[in-house]
Amino acid sequence: MNENIKLRLLENKDDLIEGTFCYSLFEESIFCPDLMTEFVEIAEFFLSYNNDLEIKQLLEWIISCVEQCFSSHHDENDYYHIKNYSIDIESKWENIWKPKLNYLLDIKGN
């Protein structure tokens, strides 16, 4: 079971796998709050039982990529644009999802 959960999380590393948060953000330019929430919840569950370096590296990568997407969105010289951008989504990223992912980087699984 844990291996299936890990593989599901790692699917986000391949931004060509439809139905993942990263596919939505990178390929469709849509920040899907439901997929981000699901990703965070699955990562939290997995890391509560496993101190997995590969998943923690994935979280660091996701944080970096999302930060870059918001930065590119705000750069008028950049072609990347988040189609469904809203201040609410960016606020939730800054105040809910990103802090939670950073917290998960620090926890040790059982």
Feature locations, PLM:
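Alpha-helical rod/repeat scaffolding segments in eukaryotic adaptors/tethers
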Residues: C22-S29, D52, K83-I87
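Short terminal alpha-helical segments
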Residues: M1-V40
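Amphipathic alpha-helical binding modules
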Residues: I63-N110
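Intrinsically disordered or highly flexible coil/loop and linker segments, enriched in small
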Residues: D15-G19, D52, D75, N110
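Generic alpha-helical secondary structure signal
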Residues: E3, D34-T37, E41, L53, ...
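Short, solvent-exposed, charged loop/turn and helix-capping segments
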Residues: E41-Q57
